[in-house]
Regions:
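Catalytic core of non-heme Fe(II) oxygenases with the double-stranded beta-helix
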Residues: 140-152, 163-235, 273-283
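A structural signal for short, well-ordered beta-strand segments
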Residues: 158-161, 197-199, 264-268
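Catalytic palm active-site di-aspartate
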Residues: 25-26, 239
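A structural signal for well-ordered alpha-helical segments within the folded catalytic domains
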Residues: 86-90, 195, 237
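Short hydrophobic-aromatic micro-motifs
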Residues: 29, 197, 242-244
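Non-heme Fe(II)-dependent double-stranded beta-helix
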Residues: 2-23, 30-179
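Conserved double-stranded beta-helix
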Residues: 220-243, 247-249, 253-327
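Aromatic-acidic/polar surface patches that form glycan- and anion
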Residues: 34, 80-85, 190, 228, ...
Length: 327
């Protein structure tokens, strides 16, 4: 008997979803967006990205498959309706534990914070100590990785259309945190630092290469190899989404059909990690400024009090003037 993933309906509680996500390493959210919306995104991508630019020939995505990066630039519908989908952001808030929650907080809250407000940022996690000569030193302690905060906010790691075509083999199983290894190794009970989402822009079936995931593999040792009986496939209808954690083994399936299997992938990472895809070249200011403030913030056009700031620019929207810099 093969492994399986738990499927949730869109109106089920975030707590139930995230509890299962933490236990199993992956979940499916059925019918999270209208199927027609996914068709609109695909049409925008095809209109804005030439066929030649969609070709792929890499070990991860071999010749015959299709890929398109910078989805938020290729499709404003993707940026506004999928990337910042409220349910997805609620789950990301619960998994990545940001200080500034992204689903509920107004984008401009804190933008005009005073110096005194900024001086208390992270209160309880730091103190100013003095030596005998009255020189002062800032001393930090780590936050609880299970309670947070684990970052100020989170950003888009990468956004890519991943299309499986006929005649390729199963993609090698891999973990999303592999892009940061060996620099960030596996530590038991470490902070979660990548959350991935794959939207089904077509139906995902076993025959057309539905994403393969290994439940509970996020708890395994690095050298444990998954048996076929331990691998589940994210079989789901168009408009559904599968989400998984940084250490969950996964990979595209093999398609035995002539039809395309199109997924729209994006990941979220803490603001203190380097983004996998360079968002500022992929989605430059002249494109980003046409998007909503929340989309801009998730893409990366925002800063914390310590990271990513630009003097003279607003921390919650770096494309406009403001006073968000610490100096």
């Amino acid at each position: 008997m093969s492994a399986s993933l738990t499927t949730f309906e869109p109106d089920e509680s975030v707590t139930e979803i995230t509890d299962t996500l933490k236990t199993d390493g992956g979940v499916i959210l059925r019918g999270l967006a209208p199927a027609g919306l996914l068709d609109s995104v695909y049409q925008e991508v095809q209109e804005n990205v030439p066929e030649a630019a969609q070709q792929s020939s890499t070990p991860l995505w071999p010749e015959g498959n299709r890929t398109v990066g910078a989805l938020a630039a290729a499709s404003s519908t993707f940026a506004e309706e999928l990337l910042i989908h409220p349910k997805v952001l609620e789950i990301a808030d619960a998994i990545l534990l940001p200080k500034r929650t992204m689903a509920s907080q107004r984008i401009d809250e804190g933008s005009n914070a005073s110096k005194e407000d900024r001086a208390t940022d992270g209160a309880g996690l730091w103190a100013v100590s003095e030596n005998k000569q009255k020189s002062t030193q800032l001393v930090w302690k780590a936050s609880d990785p299970e309670r947070g905060p684990n970052c100020d906010h989170y950003n888009l790691g990468a956004s890519v259309m991943l299309e499986v075509r006929e005649c390729n083999e199963n993609q090698v199983l891999h973990r999303e945190n592999g892009i940061y290894q060996p620099y960030i190794g596996y530590i038991p009970k470490m902070r979660e630092f990548v959350l991935s989402v794959m939207w089904a822009a077509t139906d995902f079936t076993k025959e057309n290469g539905a994403t393969r995931l290994v439940p509970e593999s996020h708890t395994w040792s690095e050298d444990r190899i998954a048996e076929e009986s331990e691998i589940a496939q994210a079989v789901m209808s168009k408009g559904s989404a599968v989400m998984w954690l940084s250490r969950t083994l996964h990979g595209a399936g093999k398609s035995r059909l002539a039809e395309r299997r199109t997924g729209l992938f994006h990941s979220f990472i803490p603001d203190w990690l380097r983004q996998e895809e360079n968002q500022y070249l992929s989605i430059p200011p002249e494109i980003a400024e046409r998007l909503s403030d929340k989309a801009k913030q998730v893409i990366g056009y925002s800063s914390s009090n310590a990271l990513g700031w630009v003097k003279g620019r607003a921390k919650d929207n770096l494309l406009v003037a403001g006073s968000g810099a610490p100096i």
